[in-house]
A protein has these predicted regions:
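Residue-level signature of catalytic and energy-coupling elements of molecular machines
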Residues: 66, 109, 170, 205-206
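Structural beta-sheet core signal
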Residues: 63, 89-91, 159
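Short Lys/Arg-rich cationic patches that frequently serve as NLS/NoLS or arginine-rich RNA/DNA-binding motifs
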Residues: 1-9
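Glycine-rich phosphate-binding P-loop
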Residues: 157-176, 206
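Short coil/loop residues immediately preceding or within conserved phosphate-binding loops
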Residues: 152-154, 177, 192
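Conserved active-site beta-strand-loop modules that form the wall/rim of enzyme catalytic pockets
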Residues: 121, 171, 201-204
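Helix-rich effector regions associated with P-loop NTPase G domains
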Residues: 2, 13-60, 68-77, 81-87, ...
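Canonical P-loop GTPase G-domain recognition
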Residues: 97-158
Length: 284
């Protein structure tokens, strides 16, 4: 890894001398500068229009969020777009999240009136509970249909969320077949797709949508860390250093175990990134 020779501080660039040590630089010099970060390609605007057009035909909405960043991975526009519809939040990737924090978030979302399901879409855990959870969420509506003689009426659920949160993978697991295209990168799903789960349940897979501007730069960083934003619009080294700083502060033991490195007091994110790179043979 090549050490950067300049650092942007308050609109100016400071040259780093060959003998300077990063830890001795002012704190603001080491700060990640991603103010104004956004990624909102044209297809996301089309997706918002499609959601608005289709929502009236839906019985319920399932919002997939990343269990590692539950609040940051919730698009603030979704509440308005889906107003009035029964809602379920699926906390995906719980296998990669802090279990204690996941429980707190699940309880918080339930307190807000959402049905909540914890899942690991890639491994399949939790996905087998989805169909029953949807029917429980809609039990009053289904009972009303039954009274009108509409037994067996198809339930239609819109599945939405930010890019690369695992929507298509989740749908494929629920449907028990690979119907929706899924890859570990944002922006793969570009159009809506209906996926039947059983004789009376259909899911509408939708492209991931962000919002035009992140007012909170911390939210932007978290979305970048978890792959919701395309790498080619990011400064990957800056973000990696910031993430290492965060992990050292909150999950030092996990960092040590994952990369088999020493995490010492005073280590900067750059130091830790360099240690990890050397440990894995990427640096000489």
């Amino acid at each position: 890894m090549k050490r950067r020779m300049h650092r942007k501080v308050g609109g100016a660039y400071i040259r780093l001398g060959a003998g300077e040590i990063r830890n001795n630089l002012p704190e603001e010099v080491c700060a990640v500068q991603i103010e104004g970060l956004s990624w909102f390609p044209g297809h996301m605007t089309k997706t918002k229009r499609m959601i608005a057009a289709e929502i009236g035909h839906m019985d319920a909405v399932c919002e997939i969020v990343d269990a590692r960043i539950p609040q940051s991975s919730r698009n603030p526009d979704v509440d308005e777009l889906t107003a009035g519809k029964p809602r379920m939040i699926v906390l995906n990737r719980v296998d990669q999240a802090d279990p204690a924090e996941t429980k707190k978030w699940a309880a918080a979302f339930r307190a807000q009136g959402f049905a909540v399901l914890e899942a690991n879409a890639k491994g399949g855990a939790g996905t087998e509970k989805f169909a029953a959870a949807v029917r429980e969420l809609l039990k009053e509506k289904l009972a009303a249909y039954a009274e009108k003689g509409q037994v067996g009426r198809t339930i239609r659920v819109m599945v939405l969320g930010i890019p690369n949160v695992g929507k298509s993978t989740f749908i494929n697991k629920v449907a028990k077949r690979k119907t929706a295209r899924a890859e570990d990168r944002p922006g793969v799903t570009r159009s809506k797709q209906w996926v039947p789960v059983d004789a009376t349940l259909e899911l509408l897979d939708t492209p991931g949508i962000l919002w035009p501007k992140f007012d909170d730069t911390e939210v932007g960083k978290r979305l970048a860390f978890t792959g919701a934003i395309k790498d080619d619009v990011l400064d990957i080294e800056e973000l990696a250093c910031y993430l290492m700083d965060y992990l050292a502060l909150h999950y030092a033991d996990v960092l040590r175990e994952r990369y088999k490195i020493d995490v010492e007091e005073g280590d900067s994110g750059y130091d830790l990134l360099e240690k990890a790179g050397r440990k894995r043979g990427f640096l000489m």
